């Protein structure tokens, strides 16, 4: 083999190797294994919080319904009870351990927008007696933003592709719908309640390059998402019986840039993808992280309210 040919072969192998490495860091989305998310303090679940009748009510979209989770791994179910093969650091950390008279009721439906939550889920609620306390978990608004994936012109409830100068009325209506949801929940639980509502995560890890996840480019997508998350934050701030679960911050670094060690959101301790195949919903590890976020806030708030 001539010297020139050896050089060409070496260069070719280097190009192939560089291409393989580039494709890995651009497209690889390893999910990892084991626990995910923050630690939950064991001591908060060491004794009973209350002997009252308590209903755990789920409202909203596919995240609360559990789409993308393996059987028994959705966050709502994991709030209630631990799966048989629970991680060692989560054994005994669940609501049924501290609320012996807990009744779970999950009305969340995959694909539901905040409009449909008001129109179809709230009418299913019937008041409980004054002895019953409501613990309400909600994920809503994400489908308002991502539907209809660029297949139709942007509209309220399906804003994908919208510009920020188009969404003012839609954002105001979302704000009003959240108040409607809270009012209806309070009517359902005259004995008291507390609402835990999550904000909306961003699978682009703050870059807004949704086109790298297989959807059309959306130049103002981050601004639209931020407008909805600002509404959720204001809603929780003005309502004394509402707590915001910061799902967005926890999921940053676990989206489509999870393997990019140079990215500002890179999570060195867990550089893995927490989303399911459809991009919209969590995988099992993502649901683990979500239940931990809810449990931490519940342990902080509920013992004093029950």
What are these regions (language model features)?
Residues 1-59, 63-84, 96-98, 131, ...:
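N-terminal secretory targeting modules
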Residues 2-6, 122-279, 284, 288, ...:
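Alpha-helical cap/lid subdomain in secreted, periplasmic
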Residues 52, 100-103, 191, 240:
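Residue-level signal for beta-strand positions within conserved beta-sheet cores that form or flank
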Residues 60, 108, 138-140:
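Short beta-strand segments
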Residues 62, 110, 199-201:
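Residue-level signal for short, function-critical loop segments
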Residues 65-128:
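N-terminal carbohydrate-binding/catalytic regions of secreted carbohydrate-active enzymes
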């Amino acid at each position: 083999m001539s010297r020139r040919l050896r050089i060409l072969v070496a260069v070719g192998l280097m190009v192939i190797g560089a291409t393989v490495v580039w494709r890995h860091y651009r497209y690889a989305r390893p999910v990892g294994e084991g626990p995910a998310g923050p630690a939950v303090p064991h001591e908060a679940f060491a004794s009973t919080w209350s002997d009252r009748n308590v209903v755990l009510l789920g409202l909203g979209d596919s995240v609360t319904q559990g789409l993308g989770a393996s059987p028994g791994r959705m966050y709502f179910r994991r709030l209630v009870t631990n799966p048989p093969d629970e991680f060692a650091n989560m054994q005994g950390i669940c609501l049924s351990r501290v609320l012996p008279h807990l009744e779970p009721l999950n009305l969340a439906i995959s694909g539901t927008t905040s409009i449909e939550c008001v129109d179809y889920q709230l009418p299913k609620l019937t008041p409980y007696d004054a002895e019953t306390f409501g613990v309400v978990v909600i994920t809503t608004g994400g489908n308002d933003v991502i539907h209809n994936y660029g297949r139709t012109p942007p509209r309220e409830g399906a804003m994908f592709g919208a510009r920020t100068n188009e969404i003012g009325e839609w954002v105001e209506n979302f704000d009003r719908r959240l108040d409607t949801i809270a009012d209806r929940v309070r009517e359902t639980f005259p004995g008291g309640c507390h609402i835990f509502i999550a904000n909306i995560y961003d699978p682009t890890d703050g870059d807004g390059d949704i086109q790298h996840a297989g959807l059309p480019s959306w130049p103002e997508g981050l601004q639209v998402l931020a407008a909805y998350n600002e509404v959720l934050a204001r809603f929780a701030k003005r309502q004394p019986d509402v707590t915001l679960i910061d799902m967005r911050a926890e999921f940053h670094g676990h989206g489509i840039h999870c393997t990019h060690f140079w990215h500002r959101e890179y999570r060195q301790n867990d550089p893995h993808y927490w989303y399911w195949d459809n991009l919209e919903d969590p995988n099992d590890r993502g649901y683990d992280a979500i239940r931990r976020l809810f449990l931490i806030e519940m342990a902080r708030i509920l013992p004093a309210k029950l």
